[in-house]
Amino acid sequence: MRSRDEYIDFLKFVGLTMIMLAHVHPPVWLYELRSFDVPLMLFASGLAFSGKQIDSQIHFLCTRTLRLVTPVYLFLIGYFIALWFLPDRHVQADEVVGSFLLLNAHSIGYVWVIKVFLLVMLCTPVMLRLDRKLNDRQWSAAILVLLVAVELSGLLLAHLKPGGLAVYYAYYETVQFVLAYSIPFLFGLRFHVVERRRKQTALFLLALLMAVVLLVLYAQTGDALHLSTRYKFPPRAAFILWGTLAAFILWSARRMLGILSRLRLIAFCGRHTLWIYLWHIPLVSLTRPLGDHWLPRLVLVWCVSLALYAVQLSLVKWVERRHPHPLLRYLRD
């Protein structure tokens, strides 16, 4: 059994930090720069799955779905119960339903990321088989086809929206998510263990493709820098390319940044990103009075989220020793 790669946990820590940074409203330039957050998390997931065998697909899909969805549902139950007792906060039925369906629209607005992980996870057995069967040229061609499919799908969405929001969001939050976010995951699968020259070649080609896309966008719109605000919802090829490139750069900088992955605090955060992410959701709202002071707000949200999860973990372990129950594992990890 392969030992846990601490640098992958470091990448997840960086990805989670970038997601939190987006939610505290940093300056526009920084908001755009850090927009590789979710692609980086998918890239790290691909690295973690690289080289693994799935003996039973049904068992894999069931256990992984429970590991992703159960903590989120437990959190949402507690979250909406807490909101119910707040006099100035009225909970709408569509907000509750949308949140439990992990939607981006008509929900609390942060749980769509979990749906991305869930959808990509459901496709993981297929992507693992493809990664093993395709040689480098075939794999590169498949990536290009996926990028084109993401763009064509985005154009299709523009035509679907006037026809009805139900169909639009159903397609947008399933097919478009899978097509787009599978790309960084596939890169993670492919480049966990490769020789340095192949990694450098892939990085160069990815950067070249990104440069071409930026030039095309600039020629068309006169502005190629607002990737997140223009091309993230729904995800388009330019946004996914930037996220994958940034993730690849961080992975290639392992020798330089590897020392950070050995810090116990970062390793702990990287192993427990889900619950820390969930705890940050109410804290984003609670820290809104800080206004434009995004850096103190980020530090406060991060530290309190981590502290709340640490308390939760200690309490769950204490209860487990006295009253073991299978549900407690989802409050722990």
Q: Positions of the model-derived regions?
A:
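Membrane-interface helix-boundary motifs at transmembrane edges
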Residues: 2-5, 53-63, 127-139, 191-203, ...
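C-terminal "closing" transmembrane helix and its immediate cytosolic amphipathic cap
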Residues: 254-273, 278-333
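Aromatic-anchored segments of alpha-helical transmembrane domains
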Residues: 17-24, 76, 144-159, 207-221, ...
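Transmembrane alpha-helical segments and their boundary/interface "anchor" motifs
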Residues: 35-39, 52-109, 115-120, 207, ...
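Functionally critical transmembrane alpha-helices in membrane proteins and complexes, commonly lining
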Residues: 6-53, 68-77
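Alpha-helical transmembrane segments and terminal signal-anchor/GPI-anchor hydrophobic tails
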Residues: 196-267, 272
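Membrane-embedded alpha-helical segments of multi-pass membrane proteins
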Residues: 36-44, 111-122, 174-187, 233-246, ...
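Hydrophobic alpha-helical segments with transmembrane-like composition
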Residues: 31-34, 83-87, 91-196
